[in-house]
């Protein structure tokens, strides 16, 4: 027997894009609440995963190498900054995964990391949680194709998020990628589930700023189509053209 109130709550949770992770590329859209430094640290952690990575694999990060990659000095202040960022990642990367037991739908509430161990030698050992691993591995294998050196050039938080959205929506090395979403979905991807802006401010302060940074630092062109219901903005379709890839239409 189903509980009607419980079923309604579950349906609401399942319909919210900020809650549900159903495949690897959804993981790229899940952490809009993180700051730019935390996004860079998370991407650095993801970079340890390769096609040969094994379940329950333990990864080791050297803070000195991380700081060098970030262009920061090996000072006590920066070491502390890294540890604080790991603390934020540990506390703010909750995952909500769809489950089904004996034909009954539900949600598993879990987290991205199984553990993060910091040692006074400057080493950090971490493991992705048992239930997050398949999504992390799928993300790295099928979606994330940019290199750490490319990530290092991107400074803004929103540009980093847009870069991830691009990779999460892209099929292999396609020249053209379309990203579609409602205004609510776009705001969730960039701002998380708590903060909201007017459509005008969101366009000017978030999307425009992110797009301009990627166009400036990567060889791409971004075209945005604003979807409206009358005068009300209801969503966006973004076309990203990767000029590094050949334009096959010239041969048609």
Regions found by a protein language model. Give the residues of each.
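Charged, alpha-helix-forming regions
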Residues: 1-252
């Amino acid at each position: 027997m189903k509980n009607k109130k419980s079923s309604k709550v579950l349906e609401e949770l399942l319909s919210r894009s900020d809650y549900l992770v159903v495949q690897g590329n959804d993981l790229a859209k899940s952490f809009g609440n993180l700051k730019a430094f935390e996004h860079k640290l998370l991407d650095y952690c993801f970079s340890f995963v390769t096609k040969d990575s094994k379940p329950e694999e333990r990864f080791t990060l050297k803070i000195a190498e991380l700081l060098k990659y970030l262009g920061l000095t090996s000072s006590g202040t920066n070491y502390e900054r890294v540890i604080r960022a790991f603390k934020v990642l540990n506390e703010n990367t909750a995952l909500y995964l769809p489950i089904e037991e004996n034909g009954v739908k539900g949600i598993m509430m879990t987290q991205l990391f199984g553990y993060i161990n910091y040692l006074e030698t400057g080493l950090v050992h971490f493991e992705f949680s048992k239930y997050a691993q398949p999504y992390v591995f799928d993300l790295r294998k099928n979606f994330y194709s940019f290199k750490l050196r490319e990530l290092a050039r991107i400074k803004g938080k929103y540009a980093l998020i847009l870069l991830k959205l691009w990779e999460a929506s892209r099929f292999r090395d396609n020249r053209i990628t379309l990203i579609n979403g409602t205004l609510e979905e776009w705001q969730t991807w960039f701002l998380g589930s708590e903060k909201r802006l007017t459509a005008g401010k969101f366009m000017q302060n978030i999307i425009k700023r992110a797009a301009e940074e990627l166009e400036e630092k990567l060889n791409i062109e971004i075209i945005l189509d604003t979807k409206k219901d009358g005068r009300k903005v209801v969503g966006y379709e973004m076309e990203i053209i990767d000029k590094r890839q050949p334009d096959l239409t010239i041969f048609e």
